[in-house]
């Protein structure tokens, strides 16, 4: 191995260049002192720290111990060495291994008192760093990681065009095959000759003759890096960076077998006690963190307010021997080893923003990083993948749930319609009868309801209707609640399952009521004040309203599961008339009256109960269905047609054996409707009808229950 004196680099280099030029084309060994300083730094890497001669540094024995591989003998002597040793640089000798061309340095240090070191460093600081000034004069250079074709015996070395034009002498492109001979010297001033040619399709710069000999001599493999450097004098130099050195992370056996007695902590402890000179062998590429730090840099890091949550950036050398900047966040701090209490060596715990490309340590030293900004504590969680996330709408915190204790826990977003298979052709009908693309906003909606987890499993306690979003219920009345039945979906969602594609989802309720001033009123529709007052007067003094009438789902085995029945005996609704409906001119039409028992105008309507209501869907009078007097309707589905309802096969209420006619839309003023296929009423229903009150005081609606073929 060879070494050079930093003070005599330029003179020795010029003398060696004259001698090497006369040796011919064969590689010739160079004498000591012929190593170029710029080439050494280029091989060491862009972030390799190296103090200048006469400078003041801080030596950290803990980092040196890690650099040596944690030798037991060195660990035993660590107790006599302080965690930080202030030193003055006596000499710097740049060395290179003859077998591997790996660079390292021998530093001669003498311990100093902190006060003496501070006075010696006054006026220097960052501007007085001689090594940074030398880097500013770095000549033209390019570095390339070798590929498999670059290391093959029959191939050559492909040089990027811009790099060839910047570092190599210019070619004569007027020739048919431009070429020239290049002469480059390595760290040991050994000359290597290559043929530089510009050829191929497309044309490119290649090093052919002499390249295979260089690869075999240096034992280069794919992944190693080769660099070419042209100085100010035009001389071309050649160096290598081995990728295996960064991966192994261990010291060179030849280096430390010869010099281990000079770099142990035992000698350091003796030198600190006697204030004598000690030598440190330092490989900048092997050390994951600096353990010899300039004094100004060390003191500057101590003045920085490092705390949890601060963001930082750090220069780091990747495997391709290029300098990169990585960012991260500080997650903690503390001593790495209790034996070195108070040591600043890797005292910061960090988390990198992206640690997939290159594995970096989770501990860094304060002088290695640069603070950028601070973040809140909520950003300390594990980072996620940068996938686009849907922007969910804000839910009103006043949108309360009874017995829920806060905002409803929607299983799905409240602002997105859920469409299942076969529902793509359906539209959504808003409260006003027009198609709406989205649900009404939840702001200013004060509703109380029971979500899907609170729905009763007892069919007799299930209520078909849920309120329209436009209606409000006083939050102060806990007895006024809405229950959902069916599939337990949120009432904000329009959901249709497979088989329900032929029917539009409805907005509204069968019994659309709200409570106010001990009376019923419709907030969305105009009404006469006299009628409302009369209605309130009739209810004055009576029991409080406990909820809309319940539509019981039958539990008898004789009743089909798709038939909906009205609850009679268990109904707690006051002032409701119960009676038997009478058949009209069509045997299959039965009617249910809605209305008060006295003093209020009645009006009868036929409202179809759709064969498959789902929870969260409501029924309104202004819907689009088939006219009741369509031609040929009773001829097919009339009472004389015995085949209907007996031999048919249905799934979710849809017949698989008969063709379902298309529906036509009626005007909003037409209130007569009929179902697609009329079926015979089961015996379990009898002639029982329930006259329940509608929310609208002057309107009575008649519901045909004999044709109901409902799905639970």
Curated annotation (Swiss-Prot):
Pfam entry (one): ARF_AD
Tissue and organ distribution: Expressed in roots, culms, leaves and young panicles.
DNA-binding region: 142-244
SMART domains hit by this protein: B3 (SM01019)
S-S bonds: none
Gene3D superfamilies: 2.30.30.1040, DNA-binding pseudobarrel domain
Tagged with keyword DNA-binding: yes
GO molecular-function terms, A-Z: DNA binding
UniProt key word DNA repair: no
Function, in words: Auxin response factors (ARFs) are transcriptional factors that bind specifically to the DNA sequence 5'-TGTCTC-3' found in the auxin-responsive promoter elements (AuxREs).
Name this polypeptide is given: Auxin response factor 15
Lineage, broadest ranks: Eukaryota, Viridiplantae, Streptophyta, Embryophyta, Tracheophyta
